[in-house]
Amino acid sequence: IRERRDARNAPMAQVRGVKQDVMIRHMRANEAVRIKYDTKFAQSSNYWKNSLGMNKCIDSTGLIRQKAEFEKRIRQYQDTTGFLKGKLDFAKMEQMYDKRLEYAKAAMYFRETFIRTNELASRALKYHNGMQVEGPAGKPKKQYVVFKDNSNEWDEALDKEVYAVLLKNYREHVSADFLPDFYKTIDEKFAGDCAAYVNYVWDKSLLMKSGTKLFINKGAVKKDLGIAMGLDITEMMSKLAVPMQDLNDSIAIQERYLCAAKIRMEEDLPHYSDANFTMRLSYGQVGGYDLGGTPSGYYTTAESIVEKMKKSDSVIEYYAEPIMHELMGAADFGKYTDETTGKLQLCFLTNNDITGGNSGSPMFNGKGELIGLAFDGNWDSLSSDIFFDKKLARCIGVDIRYVLYLMDKWGHADRLIKEIGAK
C-alpha cells in the first residue's frame, strides 16, 4: 500500500499535474488546440484525479497503520503455530518491498515522462520498437521507414513545452542512475537547458520530417540526436524493467505464502475472489452518505452543471458548447423532470459495487426497469480495491432520464426513444 501511494499514485499525480498545467494554458489560448487535446487532457486528468483521491483515502482512513496491525496478527499466528516457518519470511519481504519501491517510483516517473506524452518521444520510441521497413530485402542501404503525417493530432508548441518541462521535472525527481544518456548531451551541448535541447532536436531530427524516407542503415540516421535519444530511452526502460521483474518474481512467492497464512489464520471466515473485470451482479440501495457530519445528498441536478459551465474560463473541463447551456438552463424539463424533487436529476449515488470493469453497467430498480448506468465511484471509494468502507464507498450512476433528455433534445433521436419503448 505504501508502494501504491508513494511510488505509483504520487509520481503519477505530480507529473500529470505539471503536464496538464502546460496543456491547459495552450488549450485556453487556442480553440483549435483545445479541440485537438480535449480527449488527451481528459484521459490524463482521469487517473490524475484517481491517484489524488486514492492517496487521500489511504491517508484519511489510516490504512497503512491498519494493515500493519493486521500483519502483526499474522506474524503472531506464525510464531504460535509455526505455519510456513522457514518459508514465509517477513524481514525478507520487507527488504524486497523497500527495494522495489525505489525502482517502481523511478519507473512511474519514467513512464509518465516518456510514454505517450509528446510526439517527439513517441516517434523516437516507435522507431526503435517496431516500424514497417520498406525497400528491397537484399539491399540494407536502401531500406527505410516513413512517419506518416499526423500533424492534425498534435500541436508543436504545446508538445515542445510539455516535453521540455517533463525532462526537467524527471531530472529533479529521480536518481542520476535513472537518467537516460541523452541528458549528458543536454548538459554538454545545451548547458543543461532542456527547452533548447527539445527545440533543436524537434527542428533537426529526421523523426519529425513526416513523409521523409529514413534510411535505417545510413550515416545521417546514426548521427540523428532524436534517434539517439530514442535508443537511450529504450535502454533505460530495460534497465528499470529487469530488476523490477526479478523483484516481482521473488515477492510473488512470498505473497503466496502470506495469502496462505492469512487464509489458515481466518479459516472460519469466508474468503472471496477478486471481482475486478469479472461478470457479476451487484445489488444495493439508492442513497448518500455522511460527509464529515454533513449529508452528501444522493443526486445532482441540471442547476449544478450550469454552475460548473459558468466556471469554464478557470476550469477547462467545464467547457461546454452553447447548446448545452441552453438545454441545462431550460425552465421546464417536461417528462424528464423527477416527480418528487421537480428537478432534472443528472447522477445519483448507490451503495452498489463499482470495481474495475463496471463502467456502463445497467442499473435496475426492483421492478427490473432501467434507471441508470454505473460509471464511477466517489473519491471516498477510490481505495476500495484495497480497503472497502461500506459507510463511505458509493457508486455513481447517470440517471437514465438525463440520458433520454439529451438523446431527445440534443440528439433529436426520438425514433430511437420510441424504438426502445422508453417511458
Locate each region found by the language model.
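Terminal presequence/propeptide segments associated with secretion/organelle targeting
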Residues: 1-423
